């Protein structure tokens, strides 16, 4: 069976595991998480990210919160004269925006983990960099296009590959917005 969930925002990993257990989620099933497992609550989703590293039947699709974290990965660089010189007003603005969107709790959890296991933080950042922006899947005989937010400024006939990354993570669609018949998608 295929499962889809989104916007966990720091939901405790223990509760997510309990939810999956109640749904009888097993190794023959597949879970898509439509972004935003991090920020705002608890450990900032770091527990979920660590769990994701070892889950072959779970795929995180990049959300805007993961994208904001990746835009702040300069925080995990070694501190050198060059990195200090490169810390400019643009980076301060990027960090400030992320903090305003609930990123503090995630940054604090990752900073703590970085002291204990910098390799794990590097693995998490690598994992996030490799997350897809979307997936086309078939479940129950129906085709679905999965992404975090819809498709910003959608145009019928436009190839999916012609949209910028932000189109899949920053859109604010209405519930009744229709995009396309999946059989007509040109990826």
What do the predicted segments below correspond to?
Residues 42-44, 70-72, 156-157:
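Short glycine-/acidic-enriched loop or helix-start segments at secondary-structure transitions
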Residues 49-53, 125:
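Short amphipathic alpha-helical segments and helix-helix/interface helices
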Residues 100-185:
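Acidic, His/Gly-enriched loop-helix segments that form or flank divalent-metal centers
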Residues 7, 36, 63-64, 106, ...:
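Divalent metal-coordination and catalytic microenvironments
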Residues 1, 26-28, 55-57, 141-142, ...:
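A general structural motif
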Residues 9-10, 39, 66-67, 150-154:
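Short, solvent-exposed loop/turn segments at secondary-structure junctions
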Residues 58-115:
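A basic- and aromatic-enriched beta-loop-alpha substructure that forms the phosphate/nucleotide-
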Residues 1-49, 186:
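N-terminal active-site segment of His-dependent metallophosphoesterases
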